[in-house]
Protein backbone atom coordinates (compact mmCIF):
# COMPACT_ATOMS: atom_id res chain seq x y z
CA UNK A 1 0.00 0.00 0.00
CA UNK A 2 1.48 3.35 -1.01
CA UNK A 3 1.46 6.19 1.49
CA UNK A 4 1.21 9.79 0.33
CA UNK A 5 3.14 12.46 2.20
CA UNK A 6 1.75 15.94 2.82
CA UNK A 7 4.26 18.68 3.55
CA UNK A 8 2.41 20.75 6.14
CA UNK A 9 3.29 24.34 6.96
CA UNK A 10 3.82 25.24 10.61
CA UNK A 11 0.78 25.68 12.85
CA UNK A 12 1.24 29.45 12.86
CA UNK A 13 1.42 29.45 9.07
CA UNK A 14 -1.70 27.27 8.89
CA UNK A 15 -3.63 29.71 11.08
CA UNK A 16 -2.52 32.57 8.83
CA UNK A 17 -3.58 30.56 5.79
CA UNK A 18 -7.09 30.21 7.22
CA UNK A 19 -7.53 33.86 8.09
CA UNK A 20 -5.82 34.56 11.42
CA UNK A 21 -4.17 37.98 11.64
CA UNK A 22 -1.67 39.36 14.17
CA UNK A 23 -2.94 41.67 16.94
CA UNK A 24 -2.79 45.38 16.22
CA UNK A 25 -1.03 47.87 18.42
CA UNK A 26 -3.87 49.21 20.55
CA UNK A 27 -4.39 52.73 21.84
CA UNK A 28 -7.06 52.08 24.50
CA UNK A 29 -6.19 51.46 28.16
CA UNK A 30 -5.49 47.91 29.33
CA UNK A 31 -5.63 48.62 33.07
CA UNK A 32 -9.08 48.34 34.67
CA UNK A 33 -8.71 51.60 36.60
CA UNK A 34 -8.13 53.52 33.35
CA UNK A 35 -10.99 51.93 31.38
CA UNK A 36 -14.34 53.64 30.82
CA UNK A 37 -17.08 52.14 33.04
CA UNK A 38 -20.19 52.45 30.86
CA UNK A 39 -22.48 50.58 33.25
CA UNK A 40 -21.85 52.94 36.16
CA UNK A 41 -21.88 56.20 34.20
CA UNK A 42 -24.77 58.22 35.74
CA UNK A 43 -27.31 59.57 33.27
CA UNK A 44 -31.07 59.57 32.80
CA UNK A 45 -31.75 56.29 30.98
CA UNK A 46 -35.53 56.83 30.86
CA UNK A 47 -36.72 53.80 32.85
CA UNK A 48 -35.80 51.72 35.86
CA UNK A 49 -35.77 47.99 35.11
CA UNK A 50 -37.45 45.21 37.07
CA UNK A 51 -34.68 42.73 36.40
CA UNK A 52 -31.44 42.34 34.48
CA UNK A 53 -28.83 39.64 34.72
CA UNK A 54 -27.91 36.21 33.40
CA UNK A 55 -29.79 32.94 32.85
CA UNK A 56 -29.13 29.32 31.88
CA UNK A 57 -26.11 29.10 34.19
CA UNK A 58 -25.24 25.45 34.93
CA UNK A 59 -23.52 24.86 38.27
CA UNK A 60 -22.93 21.96 40.66
CA UNK A 61 -24.74 22.34 43.98
CA UNK A 62 -25.46 20.49 47.20
CA UNK A 63 -29.16 20.50 48.05
CA UNK A 64 -30.69 20.14 51.49
CA UNK A 65 -33.45 17.51 51.45
CA UNK A 66 -35.20 15.45 54.16
CA UNK A 67 -33.31 12.40 52.84
CA UNK A 68 -30.01 14.22 53.38
CA UNK A 69 -27.78 16.40 51.23
CA UNK A 70 -27.92 15.55 47.52
CA UNK A 71 -25.32 16.59 44.96
CA UNK A 72 -26.80 17.65 41.65
CA UNK A 73 -26.45 20.10 38.77
CA UNK A 74 -28.64 23.19 38.91
CA UNK A 75 -29.59 25.82 36.36
CA UNK A 76 -29.50 29.37 37.73
CA UNK A 77 -31.03 32.68 36.71
CA UNK A 78 -29.39 35.55 38.61
CA UNK A 79 -30.81 39.07 38.29
CA UNK A 80 -31.25 42.36 40.10
CA UNK A 81 -33.38 45.43 39.63
CA UNK A 82 -31.73 48.41 37.91
CA UNK A 83 -32.19 52.06 38.80
CA UNK A 84 -33.00 54.63 36.13
CA UNK A 85 -29.70 56.51 36.29
CA UNK A 86 -27.47 53.49 35.60
CA UNK A 87 -26.94 52.07 32.10
CA UNK A 88 -26.38 48.52 33.28
CA UNK A 89 -25.11 46.20 35.99
CA UNK A 90 -21.72 44.58 36.41
CA UNK A 91 -22.75 41.10 35.27
CA UNK A 92 -19.40 39.49 36.07
CA UNK A 93 -20.21 39.99 39.75
CA UNK A 94 -23.11 37.55 39.43
CA UNK A 95 -20.98 34.55 38.50
CA UNK A 96 -18.29 35.81 40.90
CA UNK A 97 -20.74 35.49 43.76
CA UNK A 98 -21.97 32.08 42.62
CA UNK A 99 -18.40 30.78 42.49
CA UNK A 100 -17.62 32.27 45.91
CA UNK A 101 -20.58 30.42 47.45
CA UNK A 102 -19.50 27.22 45.68
CA UNK A 103 -15.95 27.54 47.00
CA UNK A 104 -17.37 27.94 50.52
CA UNK A 105 -19.23 24.63 50.11
CA UNK A 106 -22.71 26.08 50.54
CA UNK A 107 -25.83 23.93 50.68
CA UNK A 108 -28.92 25.13 48.83
CA UNK A 109 -31.97 25.75 51.02
CA UNK A 110 -34.65 28.43 51.06
CA UNK A 111 -32.79 30.28 53.84
CA UNK A 112 -29.42 30.17 52.09
CA UNK A 113 -31.06 31.39 48.87
CA UNK A 114 -32.56 34.37 50.72
CA UNK A 115 -29.06 35.24 51.94
CA UNK A 116 -27.76 34.83 48.38
CA UNK A 117 -30.42 37.17 46.96
CA UNK A 118 -29.74 39.77 49.65
CA UNK A 119 -26.02 39.69 48.92
CA UNK A 120 -26.74 40.02 45.19
CA UNK A 121 -28.61 43.27 45.79
CA UNK A 122 -25.87 44.59 48.09
CA UNK A 123 -23.03 43.60 45.77
CA UNK A 124 -24.76 45.12 42.73
CA UNK A 125 -25.88 48.20 44.70
CA UNK A 126 -29.48 47.74 43.59
CA UNK A 127 -32.78 47.61 45.46
CA UNK A 128 -33.71 44.00 44.75
CA UNK A 129 -31.81 40.76 44.25
CA UNK A 130 -33.53 37.90 42.45
CA UNK A 131 -32.66 34.32 41.63
CA UNK A 132 -34.30 31.23 40.21
CA UNK A 133 -32.74 27.79 40.54
CA UNK A 134 -33.91 24.52 38.98
CA UNK A 135 -32.53 21.03 39.50
CA UNK A 136 -33.57 17.35 39.52
CA UNK A 137 -34.52 15.93 42.93
CA UNK A 138 -34.22 12.17 43.43
CA UNK A 139 -36.28 10.11 45.84
CA UNK A 140 -36.98 6.43 46.48
CA UNK A 141 -40.25 4.85 45.35
CA UNK A 142 -41.48 1.37 46.29
CA UNK A 143 -43.61 -0.79 44.01
CA UNK A 144 -47.25 -1.11 45.16
CA UNK A 145 -47.32 -4.92 45.59
CA UNK A 146 -43.79 -6.32 45.86
CA UNK A 147 -42.24 -3.34 47.61
CA UNK A 148 -39.26 -3.35 45.25
CA UNK A 149 -37.67 0.08 45.18
CA UNK A 150 -36.00 2.33 42.66
CA UNK A 151 -35.18 5.99 42.18
CA UNK A 152 -37.64 8.54 40.83
CA UNK A 153 -36.92 12.17 40.03
CA UNK A 154 -38.87 15.41 39.91
CA UNK A 155 -37.81 18.80 38.57
CA UNK A 156 -37.61 21.25 41.46
CA UNK A 157 -37.58 25.06 41.42
CA UNK A 158 -36.86 27.86 43.91
CA UNK A 159 -37.60 31.51 43.05
CA UNK A 160 -36.37 34.02 45.64
CA UNK A 161 -36.35 37.82 45.77
CA UNK A 162 -35.00 40.10 48.48
CA UNK A 163 -35.75 43.83 48.75
CA UNK A 164 -33.08 45.85 50.55
CA UNK A 165 -35.40 48.79 51.23
CA UNK A 166 -38.14 46.76 52.91
CA UNK A 167 -36.12 43.78 54.13
CA UNK A 168 -38.83 41.53 52.69
CA UNK A 169 -38.02 38.19 51.07
CA UNK A 170 -40.41 36.35 48.75
CA UNK A 171 -39.92 32.60 48.34
CA UNK A 172 -41.69 30.50 45.72
CA UNK A 173 -41.00 26.79 45.34
CA UNK A 174 -42.11 24.51 42.56
CA UNK A 175 -42.17 20.96 41.34
CA UNK A 176 -42.89 19.18 38.05
CA UNK A 177 -43.83 15.52 38.33
CA UNK A 178 -45.30 12.91 35.98
CA UNK A 179 -48.37 10.86 36.91
CA UNK A 180 -50.85 8.44 35.34
CA UNK A 181 -54.29 9.79 34.43
CA UNK A 182 -57.23 7.65 33.33
CA UNK A 183 -60.11 9.27 31.45
CA UNK A 184 -63.43 9.25 33.39
CA UNK A 185 -65.45 9.64 30.18
CA UNK A 186 -63.72 6.71 28.51
CA UNK A 187 -64.35 4.55 31.58
CA UNK A 188 -68.00 5.58 31.75
CA UNK A 189 -68.93 4.92 28.13
CA UNK A 190 -66.79 1.87 27.34
CA UNK A 191 -67.82 -1.74 27.90
CA UNK A 192 -64.34 -2.44 29.20
CA UNK A 193 -61.05 -0.63 29.81
CA UNK A 194 -60.40 3.11 29.45
CA UNK A 195 -57.70 5.16 27.79
CA UNK A 196 -54.98 6.45 30.06
CA UNK A 197 -51.87 8.53 29.60
CA UNK A 198 -48.98 10.28 31.26
CA UNK A 199 -49.83 13.59 32.89
CA UNK A 200 -47.41 16.38 33.74
CA UNK A 201 -48.20 18.27 36.93
CA UNK A 202 -46.60 21.67 37.54
CA UNK A 203 -47.02 23.24 40.99
CA UNK A 204 -45.63 26.58 42.15
CA UNK A 205 -46.28 27.64 45.74
CA UNK A 206 -45.45 30.92 47.47
CA UNK A 207 -44.32 30.22 51.03
CA UNK A 208 -44.96 32.16 54.22
CA UNK A 209 -41.43 33.05 55.36
CA UNK A 210 -42.46 32.90 59.02
CA UNK A 211 -43.61 29.27 58.84
CA UNK A 212 -41.54 27.71 56.04
CA UNK A 213 -38.71 26.42 58.25
CA UNK A 214 -39.11 22.71 58.89
CA UNK A 215 -41.75 22.42 56.16
CA UNK A 216 -40.96 19.45 53.91
CA UNK A 217 -42.35 21.24 50.88
CA UNK A 218 -40.96 18.81 48.29
CA UNK A 219 -42.78 15.88 49.88
CA UNK A 220 -45.91 18.01 50.39
CA UNK A 221 -46.10 19.13 46.75
CA UNK A 222 -45.24 15.65 45.51
CA UNK A 223 -48.02 14.14 47.62
CA UNK A 224 -50.50 16.80 46.47
CA UNK A 225 -49.79 15.85 42.86
CA UNK A 226 -49.60 12.07 43.16
CA UNK A 227 -52.33 11.44 45.73
CA UNK A 228 -54.84 13.26 43.51
CA UNK A 229 -53.81 11.56 40.27
CA UNK A 230 -55.25 8.35 38.91
CA UNK A 231 -51.99 6.66 39.93
CA UNK A 232 -48.35 7.53 40.58
CA UNK A 233 -45.50 6.32 38.37
CA UNK A 234 -42.99 3.68 39.45
CA UNK A 235 -39.41 2.90 38.38
CA UNK A 236 -39.75 -0.84 39.11
CA UNK A 237 -42.90 -2.90 38.42
CA UNK A 238 -43.18 -6.68 38.43
CA UNK A 239 -46.37 -8.32 37.19
CA UNK A 240 -48.18 -8.11 40.57
CA UNK A 241 -47.17 -4.43 40.78
CA UNK A 242 -48.33 -3.68 37.24
CA UNK A 243 -51.67 -5.32 38.00
CA UNK A 244 -52.13 -3.21 41.11
CA UNK A 245 -50.98 0.03 39.45
CA UNK A 246 -53.45 -0.53 36.61
CA UNK A 247 -56.28 -1.21 39.04
CA UNK A 248 -55.46 1.87 41.13
CA UNK A 249 -55.69 4.05 38.02
CA UNK A 250 -59.03 2.48 37.06
CA UNK A 251 -60.37 3.15 40.57
CA UNK A 252 -59.40 6.85 40.35
CA UNK A 253 -60.36 8.32 36.95
CA UNK A 254 -59.37 11.97 36.51
CA UNK A 255 -59.87 14.74 33.99
CA UNK A 256 -57.22 17.48 33.91
CA UNK A 257 -59.88 19.73 35.47
CA UNK A 258 -60.29 17.25 38.34
CA UNK A 259 -56.56 17.08 38.94
CA UNK A 260 -56.10 20.84 39.15
CA UNK A 261 -59.04 21.33 41.53
CA UNK A 262 -58.03 18.48 43.83
CA UNK A 263 -54.41 19.64 44.05
CA UNK A 264 -55.59 23.22 44.66
CA UNK A 265 -57.66 21.98 47.61
CA UNK A 266 -54.61 20.31 49.17
CA UNK A 267 -52.50 23.45 48.70
CA UNK A 268 -55.26 25.60 50.16
CA UNK A 269 -55.10 23.53 53.34
CA UNK A 270 -51.32 23.99 53.74
CA UNK A 271 -50.80 26.88 56.17
CA UNK A 272 -47.24 27.42 54.90
CA UNK A 273 -48.53 28.19 51.38
CA UNK A 274 -49.87 31.71 50.72
CA UNK A 275 -50.46 31.48 46.96
CA UNK A 276 -50.14 28.86 44.28
CA UNK A 277 -50.25 27.96 40.60
CA UNK A 278 -51.19 24.48 39.37
CA UNK A 279 -51.18 23.16 35.82
CA UNK A 280 -51.98 19.68 34.52
CA UNK A 281 -51.05 18.66 30.98
CA UNK A 282 -52.03 15.26 29.63
CA UNK A 283 -50.38 13.73 26.57
CA UNK A 284 -53.64 12.27 25.29
CA UNK A 285 -53.24 8.67 24.13
CA UNK A 286 -56.18 8.83 21.67
CA UNK A 287 -55.47 12.32 20.29
CA UNK A 288 -52.53 14.16 18.76
CA UNK A 289 -53.15 17.11 21.04
CA UNK A 290 -52.61 17.56 24.79
CA UNK A 291 -55.30 18.41 27.33
CA UNK A 292 -54.48 21.21 29.78
CA UNK A 293 -55.99 22.95 32.81
CA UNK A 294 -54.57 25.45 35.30
CA UNK A 295 -55.43 27.61 38.30
CA UNK A 296 -53.78 30.58 40.02
CA UNK A 297 -54.92 31.35 43.56
CA UNK A 298 -53.81 33.80 46.27
CA UNK A 299 -55.17 33.06 49.74
CA UNK A 300 -54.54 36.66 50.80
CA UNK A 301 -56.82 38.04 48.07
CA UNK A 302 -59.10 35.27 46.82
CA UNK A 303 -60.21 33.68 50.09
UniProtKB/Swiss-Prot annotation:
GO biological process, one term: tetrahydrofolate biosynthetic process
Pfam family, one: GCHY-1
Positions of the record's site feature: May be catalytically important: 183
GO MF annotation, one: GTP cyclohydrolase I activity
Catalytic class of the enzyme: hydrolase
Gene3D superfamilies xrefs: Urate Oxidase
Keyword line: Hydrolase
The family this protein is said to belong to: Belongs to the GTP cyclohydrolase IV family.
Function: Converts GTP to 7,8-dihydroneopterin triphosphate.
Protein's name according to its UniProt entry: GTP cyclohydrolase FolE2
Organism: Exiguobacterium sp. (strain ATCC BAA-1283 / AT1b)
Name of the gene: folE2
